[in-house]
Every structure is written in C-alpha cells, then in structure tokens.
Design a protein with these regions (language model features):
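Hydrophobic alpha-helical transmembrane segments
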Residues: 8-12, 48, 143-148, 188-192, ...
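Hydrophobic alpha-helical transmembrane segments of multi-pass inner-membrane transport and secretion
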Residues: 6-33, 41-75, 99-112, 226, ...
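Hydrophobic alpha-helical segments
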Residues: 100-244
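Juxtamembrane interface at the cytosolic side of transmembrane helices
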Residues: 64, 72, 164, 210, ...
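N-terminal Sec/SRP start-transfer signal
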Residues: 1-19, 183-188, 197, 233-281, ...
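Short helix-loop junctions at transmembrane helix boundaries
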Residues: 27-38, 110-142, 199-217, 607-668
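Basic-flanked hydrophobic alpha-helices used for secretion and membrane insertion
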Residues: 301-558
Length: 668
C-alpha cells in the first residue's frame, strides 16, 4: 500500500469522505431530537433519500476505483506469483490490505462523520429558520449502519479481486497493466442513436410548458440525455478523431499526432470516462441550482401568500344559501385575539372567485368547462376592487359595472373586450358575461405564487354583484364541480412567532365549541393559516432540499474529481513509455509539454462544456417544475443556475491545474 500510495491515498480519502457523508445523514435520521421539532417530516424524508442516493453512488464509485487499482497492480501481483508466492498468499495479502483499508477508511470516516454531524446540525439551523433540538452526540446505531454498509462494499470489492486473481495466470497478471485496446471501429448506428436520444431529450426539455407534464417527463428527458451523452461521447468522439487523422495537414504535426493517435487507441475507455464526468457535473449543477432557487424563493412565496400574520380562508356556497358576514367575522377575530392577550393591528377582508378556464384562441373567449390543451388553460381569479386593495395595500381601482382591471398580462391574442362563456359537454350554457378591460394593474403576488399548475389570470371587477353573476355562470357549466365563493381575512398581529403559533392552536381548540362562530353568517369551512407556521413548513422543505443538495453535490463532486484524477494518472502511466520513445527520437521538452497540455485541455474541458449545454437546455424544464412549488420568479432561477455554473467551473479549473501537474510529473 505504501508503494502504491499515489493510488491508495485518494481511495482512502474517498472512502473516508463517503463514509462521513453517509454517517451524517444516518445520524440526523437517528437523532431523537428530530422528532421533537416542527417540520421533522421534511428533514427525515430528505435524509432518507440522501442515504439511498449516497449509498448507490458510493457502491458504484468504490467498485470503479477498486477495478482501476487492480489493473494498475496486476504487474506487481504477477511478479509475486512468478517469484514463488502462491495465489493463496496473494489472496492473504489482499485480505490484509482490505482490513487496513477498512480500519483507515471507515474508521477515519466515522471520526470525521461525528465531527461533521455537529457542523451539519449548526448548518441546518440557518437553513431551516427555526431552532433544532438536536443532541449532536455520536450515534451508535448510525455508526453501526454505516460501518456495516461500507464493510459490505469492501468485502464485495475483495471478492471481485480474489475472483480475478483466481482466474488469471502469472503471465496475464504480469502484463495485465500493459494490455491495450485495439483501435475502435466507427459505430455510426450508435452515433445516430445518441443524436436521436439527445435531440429528443433536448426537445422535451425546451418545449414542455405545463408544470405537471414537466414533472412527469423530467426523468424521461434525463434518461434520453444520459443515453445520448454516452453514445455520442463513445461513437462521435471516435468518428471525430478519425476525421482529424484523415486531415494530413492537421494530423502530421507533432502535438496533434501524439494527442490524436494516443487518445484514439484508448477511446472506448476514455469516452466512457468523459461521459461519466459530464453526467456527474450536470447532476451537481442541476441539484445545487434547483435546490438553491427553491430555497431562495421561499421568502418571496411566504411574503406573497401571507401578507398578514394570519390568513383565514372562508368558503361558502351560494347554491346552499350560504353567505359570510364579513363584519361579523372580523369582530370574532378581534374579540378572540384580545381574549388571548395578542394585539390585533388590523383585519382586512378580500372576497374572490377561483376556477379554471380555457383561453380559447379559436373563439377568443375564456371558456369555463371547455376541454383543450393544458398550455391554453388559466387559473382565473376574480375579485372586487375592495378585495384588490386588501390583498395588495394599493388604492382600489375605480370601475364601472361591466368593466374590469387586468392584473398582469392577458393571454396571447386576447384584446380589451373579454367574454366569459360556460361550456358543458361541448355546448354553450348560461349567460355569457362580457367585461371591458379598462385598466392594467401589476400582477397580484398573492395569486401568482400559488401552487396552481395553470398560469394565473386575475381580473378585478366592480362589485359583489358581478362576482355573483360569474359564480352562477361557472356553476351552470361545472355543475357538481363548481367552485365556492371564497373570502380571506388578513389579520395583522403584534406578537412573536411563538405567540402567533399559540394563538392558532388556541383558535383550533376553541372553534369546536358550540356557538363559537355565531354572528359570522353561514359557510362551508373556515381554515386558519399562519405565516410563522408556513415559514416552518416552507423552510423545512426547502432547507432540507438545499442541505441534501449540498451534501449530495459534494459527493458527486468528489466522484467527479476522483474519476478525473484516476483517469489522468492511468493515462500518464500509459503515455510514459510513449513519450520516452518520442524524446529519444528528438522531441524537445517544450514539445512534450505542449502536447500534454493539449490532451489535458481536451480531456478536461469537453465534459464541462457539454454539461453547460445540458444545463442550458434543462433550464426550462427545471423552471417549470419549480412553479409547482410556488417559485415563479424566473430571474431567481437564472441567477442560481448562472452562479452555480460559474462556481462549479472555478472548482473544475482548480482540479485541472492540479491534475495537469500530476500528469506531467508522471510522463516526465
């Protein structure tokens, strides 16, 4: 192991790092303090997902590195065999090496994991935005689980090594490290399959507009892009190199001759390695940018959906002769809060109607109950001018009967004259309602950040009479699926988050008492939501996602760096003899270095360039999916994606600088 420390040291560091990351997530799940905090479900689910992904990646990465180590050591093991050491003795050596690897790698990883566990709990506090009663001490169950899992992986690697040695003869072992590959054929079918798969994946990513469809097709698009990447790196790169070789003016230059011929004879393995680096790099950037955008968007979502401390949503059905007394409801809220010792600084009420419509480009109407493409569907919100003022804090628009103010933009192709028509079974029903768009107002954030899958369209009408007409129209079209009318009470309080949560709990206890809601009219349900509670849930989910994204991102980055390192080291040893020959026939030191730099640049920066292209095509798909979580600010996603790409590129360049030196030292 000491003699091969150039290979074993990164392996031990990788094993320790993977062990530490796995232990941290396992310890967070096993910590009894998790069950004592609000939003613990999100942390538990995130960590369990992380453990599964980290476990799969650890198995793949460790077995990959083990395979590389065995190939590099075949000559050494073959020499032992020729000198008289039997296969049983070689197997015993490998068993001892595996034992030392387990002690140093797993043991060191557990020590690091215990230290990082405390750091992880400290890092989660600012991410989740609420206190965490973690114990932070070493977790014996997590240590046992981690040690058993990675011990099993090392046993599996040992079994594979012993099997390889058993099937080999001394001559094969002696020359195993020098076994080269035949020149690969140009596989046009694979290249065509790769181009089709990559094009199909890109097409899905760019053209999908419906968020629900984006969620369903995301993994299909990812699978197609992965297949396309592997096929094109394997077949396309070979075709490109052979085309370069046919170009005599290009090929018969010192640097080009060495680089092209050297890569061509090992292209099958190199191409798969480059594809691995590309896919892992893409995963790191997508994971970090997506989770960061989700996390940073939480503040905007909470501020928009909860303009006051409490949102009290009351639904009532006019078909059942129900009607809410807004003044009575406001009086109840004021009285109850006063009894609980919580000062109320204001209660605003907004009444609105919400149902889905089809923005039919053929008829130029907003059709209720009509069937059509999801991309033409809109979540229609209708509210009074008074409700607009309550939700936004702006002055109420002055509207005449039959007029409307459009908040945001109308669907493409629609003018100022709007007609809302009911459709039932393909036929028109009810009295169509015509509205003249008299004013244009900014979008209402309260509706824009909802979790509705359809794009919101908000119209402000003059009064409750128009709301009643529109409710009657959609009731005829949708029948049993008709929407109720909704009122929201926005309650501003002067209290701490803890007092706010206690007030909500007290309301829930008192609301079951008979006569509690006397004087508020009749209604179907009354739901109370707290800004403080939403912050706990929102940041619990988004913070858990971001923490998981960071941990898995580090693991994926570790895998990327190790694949790059071992790839460059293996190429360095394979090229060592070739460059020695070239120097003997007159190649200068400067020419050797120039040739190395050209190869390393291609090997390193082709994967990151392709990964950047993947990110650009994937942007629309990620942005659409994030709308399902309420993140509709595209600029937030743009900044997170661009920042992640820039940061990853900086790390990538640093790895390049370090690896280029290692490669050059070997061939020198």
């Amino acid at each position: 192991m000491k003699q091969n420390r150039r290979f074993f040291l990164p392996y031990l560091l990788a094993l320790a790092g993977l062990t530490a990351a796995f232990y941290v997530m396992s310890a967070l799940c096993a910590d009894p303090g998790v069950l004592e905090m609000r939003g613990f479900e999100y942390v538990m689910v995130m960590m369990q997902i992380g453990m599964f992904v980290a476990g799969v990646l650890s198995a793949v990465l460790l077995l990959y590195i083990n395979s590389f180590l065995m190939k590099q050591r075949k000559k050494e093991l073959g020499l032992y065999n020729i000198l008289g050491m039997g296969k049983g003795n070689i197997a015993l050596i490998q068993c001892w090496e595996s034992l030392f690897t387990a002690i140093l790698g797993i043991g060191g990883g557990l020590v690091l994991g215990v230290a990082f566990h405390k750091l992880a709990t400290l890092a989660l506090v600012p991410l989740l935005k609420f206190s965490i009663p973690f114990h932070g001490s070493a977790s014996l169950p997590a240590m046992v689980e981690t040690a058993v899992f990675f011990g099993f992986l090392l046993l599996l690697a040992l079994a594979l090594n012993l099997f390889r040695v058993r099937l080999s003869n001394p001559i094969e072992l002696l020359h195993g490290g020098n076994v080269g590959e035949k020149e690969p054929r140009t596989r046009w079918l694979m290249a065509a399959v790769g181009a089709v798969c990559l094009g199909a994946g890109y097409f899905i990513a760019v053209t999908v507009k419906d968020p629900a469809l984006a969620m369903l097709l995301y993994f299909l698009a990812v699978l197609l892009v992965i297949i396309g990447t592997y096929c094109l790196f394997t077949a396309g790169s070979i075709a490109l190199l052979k085309l370069l070789r046919k170009n005599k003016g290009f090929y018969y230059q010192t640097g080009h001759f060495i680089g092209v011929s050297g890569m061509l004879y090992r292209m099958k393995r190199n191409a798969v390695g480059l594809a691995n680096i590309c896919i892992l790099s893409t995963m790191v950037m997508v994971m970090l940018s997506g989770t960061l955008a989700l996390y940073l968007g939480q503040g905007e979502i909470i501020a928009a959906q909860y303009p006051a401390n409490l949102n009290m949503t009351v639904s009532f059905d006019p078909a059942q002769n129900q009607d809410l007394d807004l003044d009575g409801a406001a009086s109840l809220v004021n009285r109850f809060a006063r009894e609980q010792g919580v000062p109320v600084t204001g209660v605003d009420a907004a009444e609105y109607l919400h149902f889905n419509v089809l923005a039919n480009p053929a008829t130029g109407r907003l059709e209720v109950g009509a069937q059509g493409e999801n991309t033409d569907r809109r979540a229609l919100y209708l509210l009074t001018a008074q409700g607009y003022a309550a939700l936004t804090g702006d002055r109420a628009p002055s509207l005449q009967p039959g007029e409307a103010a459009v908040c945001g933009a109308l669907p493409e192709g629609f003018g100022p004259e709007l007609t809302i028509q009911g459709i039932d079974g393909g036929r028109e029903v009810g009295d169509p309602q015509s509205l003249h768009s008299a004013q244009a107002l900014p979008e209402i954030e309260y509706f824009r950040t909802t979790f509705d899958m359809n794009e919101p369209l908000c119209l402000v009408v003059s009064d409750r009479t128009m709301l009643a007409r529109l409710w009657a129209l959609q009731s005829q079209a949708l029948d049993n699926y008709a929407a109720n009318r909704t009122a929201v009470l926005l309650v501003d309080l002067e209290c701490t988050n803890e007092e706010e949560l206690a007030l909500v709990d007290a309301w829930a206890d008192a609301s079951v008492n008979e006569g509690f809601f006397d004087g508020t009219g009749t209604w179907e349900y009354w739901r109370v939501e707290s800004r403080a509670e939403m912050a706990v849930d929102g940041y619990g989910m988004a913070g858990g996602f971001l923490f998981l994204g960071i941990v898995l991102g580090i693991i994926f980055l570790m895998a990327t760096v190790l694949i790059i390192y071992y790839k460059q080291v293996s190429e360095g040893y394979e090229d060592q003899g070739r460059f020695e020959i070239m120097r003997k026939v007159g190649l200068s030191q400067r020419q050797v270095k120039s040739s190395i730099r050209g190869q390393v640049l291609i090997v390193f920066f082709l994967p990151i360039l392709v990964a950047a292209v993947h990110i650009l095509f994937d942007f629309n798909l990620v942005a659409r999916m994030l709308t399902m979580f309420g993140v509709r600010n595209v600029m937030t996603v743009v900044l997170c994606t661009g920042g992640t790409l820039a940061a990853f590129l900086a790390v990538y360049v640093l790895v390049y600088l370090l690896t280029a030196r290692t490669y050059y030292k070997i061939v020198k």
